[in-house]
From Swiss-Prot:
One of its GO terms (cellular component) is cytoplasm. Transmembrane segments: none annotated. This is STE20-related kinase adapter protein stlk. SUPFAM superfamilies: Protein kinase-like (PK-like). Pfam families: Pkinase. It comes from Drosophila melanogaster (Fruit fly).
Length: 346
């Protein structure tokens, strides 16, 4: 897919997201084709720009249908512009807040995870760790899910040699820690491997199935203690309720979930087992991404597709109004810079 490196060839239609580093717009190119354009100011702390450069350099090396590939990247005046293929359903976190408020259907989760695991299998085979898997970083279209946000991606290759372990933190902001594996939180000399992404998959399963992030509204210290102890997050359904003798008080939120919401849910035993495998405290006992793709939980993907499962999503999305952090209705036509030559591209 060829894409122009001249900002005057794009019409920025509306703001999709105001992120930590930049703003993402829905845009059209000169052929009226929709795409996403990320606009990043160079006038910000170097640590944020380093995250941007890390993402660009990493994604340029990775080519996979389930990775949110950068189509082009260029500089105009004091802004860096990155263009991506447009994923019309946005990210899974926004969908949880506005459409699937009680969680995604299990079959939809299986289809989404199949694509994400395919991306992780490839990423790990290229000796990288994504380091930030969560619903917010999974984008959807009618035909596929893609993994995005490679700002915290790390490589096992250093100075031409492959390391066995990675040391240090993969996350730079507090709110990402809820999805982080315990071995990263330890910050000890043992380091960690690509299995931290598998743990994050387990947390993301709970997030997408239950309708909210695990450990929501709890202190970081409590979350840290629970993970170090090996306390498992669970899929909340009638089976969870029965196992807890009819009363399930959630340790990871200050609010009690309505009992009738839980009793009306029933996840398969395969799904429960899949999550337990991902959230094993011992990283050596977690399955690799490639092995998880053979798990019985994903067999339900065989006779359906994302297109089948999400066919009514467009209509559902039209019924909710996104807040100011997700879309600005007055953004149309007001964000285009004046035409000029591109200074550089990479």
């Amino acid at each position: 897919m060829m894409c122009s490196n001249n900002i005057s060839d794009y019409k920025l239609l509306e703001i999709l997201k105001n992120g930590m580093i930049g703003t993402v717009y829905k845009a059209e190119d000169i052929n009226n084709k929709c795409l996403a354009v990320k606009k990043v100011s160079m006038d910000q702390p170097m640590e944020k720009l380093t995250l941007l450069f890390n993402e660009v350099l990493t994604v340029r090396r990775l080519q996979h249908r389930n990775i949110n590939t950068i189509v082009s990247c260029f500089l105009y005046k004091q802004y860096v512009y990155l263009t991506y293929k447009f994923m019309c359903f946005g990210n899974c976190e926004v969908l949880l807040k506005n459409v699937y408020t009680s969680g995604f259907p299990e079959v939809a989760i299986a289809l989404i995870l199949k694509d994400v695991l395919s991306a992780l299998t490839y990423i790990h085979s290229e000796h990288y760790v994504h380091g930030s898997v969560r619903a917010k970083h999974i984008l959807l279209s009618p035909r596929k899910a893609v993994l995005s946000n490679f700002s915290y991606c790390q490589s096992f290759i250093s100075q031409g040699e492959k390391k066995t372990f990675i040391f240090g933190s993969t996350v730079g902001i507090e709110k990402e820690l809820y999805w982080t594996a315990p071995e990263v939180l330890y910050q000890n000399l043992s380091g960690y491997t690509e299995k931290i992404d598998i743990y994050s998959i387990g947390i993301t399963c709970c997030e997408m199935a239950n309708g909210f992030q695990p450990f929501k509204d709890t202190e970081l210290t409590y979350m840290y203690i629970e993970k170090v102890r090996g306390s498992l997050q669970v899929l909340l359904d009638k089976n969870s309720l029965l196992e807890n003798q009819g009363s399930l008080s959630l340790e990871h939120t200050n609010k009690r979930i309505a009992r009738d919401v839980i009793v009306n849910k029933s996840f398969s035993e395969n799904f429960h087992q899949f999550v337990e495998l991902c959230l094993n405290k011992n990283p050596l006992s977690r399955w690799a991404a490639s092995k998880l793709m053979t798990h019985s939980f994903l067999k339900q993907c065989r006779n359906t597709s994302l297109l089948d499962q999400l066919k009514d999503l467009g209509q559902k999305m039209s019924k909710f109004k996104r807040n100011e952090h997700e879309i600005f209705s007055d953004a149309r036509g007001s964000h285009n810079p004046q035409p000029n030559d591109t200074i550089w591209k990479f």
